Amino acid sequence: MSILFTTLMLLIPIFLILIKRKRSAKKLPPGSLGLPIIGQSLSLLRAMRANTAEKWLEKRIKKYGPISKLSLFGNPTVFLHGPAANKFIFTSSCSIITNQQVKSIQMVLGDRSLLELTGDDHKRVRNALMLFLRPESLKDCVGKLEEEIRWHLEMHWQGKQQVTVLPLMKTLTFNIISSLLFGIQRGSQRDKLVGLFRQMMGGMWSVPLNFPFTRYRRSLQASKLAQNMLRQLISEKRVDLEQKGASPHQDLITCLLSIRNDNNEEMITEEEMVHNVLLVMTAGHDTSSVLITFMLQFLSNEPAVYENVLQEQENIARTKEAGMFLTWEDLSKMKYTWRVAMETLRMIPPIFGSFRKALKDIEYGGYLIPKGWQIFWASPMTHMDNNIYPEPTKFDPNRFENQASVPPCSFVGFGGGPRMCPGIEFARIETLITIHYLVTRFTWKLCADSTFSRDPMPVPAQGLPLQINQKNPL
């Protein structure tokens, strides 16, 4: 027995050395991890705020190729570039790559959101969200959404000579989310939540240093207060559902509360509801407001595109009597307008990039991606690739006339694979109805140049001020 034990004790170190040598024989990607914790985080954030992040990554690609190592937001990271890399990231098994975000995003939004869940938990929560966000359910929301948009235009656009678009679109999209998804009516509760939410967003992409007066600390504090508000709202919705006969379809939170398992227990935990409500707020508020804002900018700069959108929307408006709401069929006719939205997303994607995490050592492109490292991809790098989209700086909605002609995994405005954004249809409806009323009721001219920065979302110069004139009804 002692001989066997001694032999094993001698063999184990040899075995470990062989494993280490085998792993070290695989090359890490070229590049540098930079300074501890900080790495290249500040450099990338500066480039995003100066609207040079694409050039920042292009320099890396020219220097190191499509695979390189760096350190972002406190973690060693591998940057991957190209449609093949996108496909690898989007379609790899969750046992190989998981959808873990950087620490700052994880801590602000919570660890039970779709951004963090994997496997059966991800499927369960995503399916629950899709019960409300699928087209069949959203058809019943068109009128309610349209009411919010009409009210917004009456309050903030009519009678004005100049407006600043981005803050107004943020107000509009937050009100739509509050009403349709959370059932929060206009008033002090909505106003308090939007203030917390905006403060929360400020530190989501930041170095996770939890010190006083940092953006990250303020973001964490706002997230905690917002989560407490949402827990109170969930309790009220639970009472309405169980004791007052509220409809399960009246808003997203009530819908989630109504989903039961075989033991008649809530399918989604309260923590999952809170974290995913924060995620929906983030995804639905900032991304949609940015998309609509930059659509108006491109329509200002592209007269031929504007005329095509105007004609499409006026043709629909002429079929309506005064006060009539749009229908699902009307939205299905707005094909060119949606192509304009897709081209806007291609040229200025609201989400610059995202992260995954390697759950085991991965060999890709001849290099080792070590277990535990982040994997980073950036959507503009394929969106603006001349080999994929000829004349990529030209605004051309007809690129999306035939979806089959778009190379797989090259347009990633909504992500891809099983983790594609579940709110695509909601974003489409919100965008189309808003653009319909803007182009049929107003004309506008830009008051500032067309530059923008990222912080981390794209922000146009001065928030995109417009000089507007109200049109006569058709």
Residue ranges, per PLM feature:
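Conserved cytochrome P450 K-helix E-x-x-R motif and the immediately C-terminal K′/meander segment
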Residues: 44-58, 63-65, 225-232, 323-365, ...
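Cytochrome P450 catalytic-core helices
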Residues: 287-305, 310, 425-440
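Cytochrome P450 proximal C-terminal region
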Residues: 3, 7-16, 29-32, 61, ...
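Conserved, non-catalytic sequence blocks in retroelement Pol enzymes and Pol-derived host proteins
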Residues: 27-30, 134-140, 242-246, 328-335, ...
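N-terminal membrane-proximal hinge/A-helix region immediately C-terminal to the signal-anchor transmembrane segment
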Residues: 2-124, 139, 143-154, 353, ...
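Conserved cytochrome P450 K-helix/beta-meander segment immediately N-terminal to the heme-binding cysteine loop
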Residues: 377-404
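Cytochrome P450 heme-thiolate monooxygenase catalytic core
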Residues: 98-106, 117, 121, 137-290, ...
